[in-house]
Amino acid sequence: MKLSPKAAIEVCNEAAKKGLWILGIDGGHWLNPGFRIDSSASWTYDMPEEYKSKIPENNRLAIENIKDDIENGYTAFIITLKM
């Protein structure tokens, strides 16, 4: 699912509340219709074995990445979560 910047940040916040790890974020451009991913706007954060205590930090970094991408003109995002 492609997400608006606001929705992507909301997904990160909800993931933190539910204890879900954000594995990656891919930024791109919404073309109406369609989505063009930009491989230079891809963020990943390796999940350590003892990841539960690091979920807040992981999700904070994910949100910071989205905000940086917004400043660089990206308008849509795909988020990959670890259930």
UniProtKB/Swiss-Prot annotation:
Keyword Oxidoreductase in annotation: no
Gene3D superfamilies cross-referenced by the UniProt entry: 3.30.190.30
Pfam families (UniProt xref): ImmE5
UniProt superkingdom: Bacteria
SUPFAM superfamilies, per database record: ImmE5-like
GO biological-process terms attached to the record: bacteriocin immunity
Keywords: Bacteriocin immunity, Plasmid
Reported function: This protein is able to protect a cell, which harbors the plasmid ColE5 encoding colicin E5, against colicin E5.
Name of the molecule in the record: Colicin-E5 immunity protein
Natural source organism: Escherichia coli
Gene name of this polypeptide: imm
